[in-house]
Amino acid sequence: MEKQNIRIKLRAYDNKILDASTEEIVNTVKRTGATIKGPIPLPTRIERYTVLKGPHIDKKSREQFETRTHKRLIDIIEPTPQTVEALMKLDLASGVDVEIKI
């Protein structure tokens, strides 16, 4: 039978919330007895926006804004049924986007 792995990708704008969520997932998986790889930090995506400060003139005066999207990757190797059930019951912070692939 083929080994079944679960890959969890987490994304958030705030890295503190993201680290807390990954720690919660890692503790839950370790408690159920499955082996885990990670959390692996993926490259942070930085989007910059440049806007004119004044409404009419002064092209030289501009303001820059940026959004940073932090990412983490967790691999669960050979998950037990208790692991899957515990992950489904897990309640994470609202600012974290979770993507799960089996």
Curated annotation (Swiss-Prot):
Family listed: Belongs to the universal ribosomal protein uS10 family.
Functional summary from the UniProt entry: Involved in the binding of tRNA to the ribosomes.
Species whose genome carries this gene: Pelagibacter ubique (strain HTCC1062)
One GO BP annotation of this record: translation
Alphabetical list of PANTHER family matching this protein: 30S RIBOSOMAL PROTEIN S10 FAMILY MEMBER
Record's keyword terms, sorted: Ribonucleoprotein, Ribosomal protein
Protein name: Small ribosomal subunit protein uS10
Gene Ontology CC, one term: ribonucleoprotein complex
InterPro entries the UniProt entry points to: Ribosomal_uS10, Ribosomal_uS10_CS, Ribosomal_uS10_dom, Ribosomal_uS10_dom_sf
Subunit structure: Part of the 30S ribosomal subunit.
GO MF term (any one): structural constituent of ribosome
Top-rank taxon: Bacteria
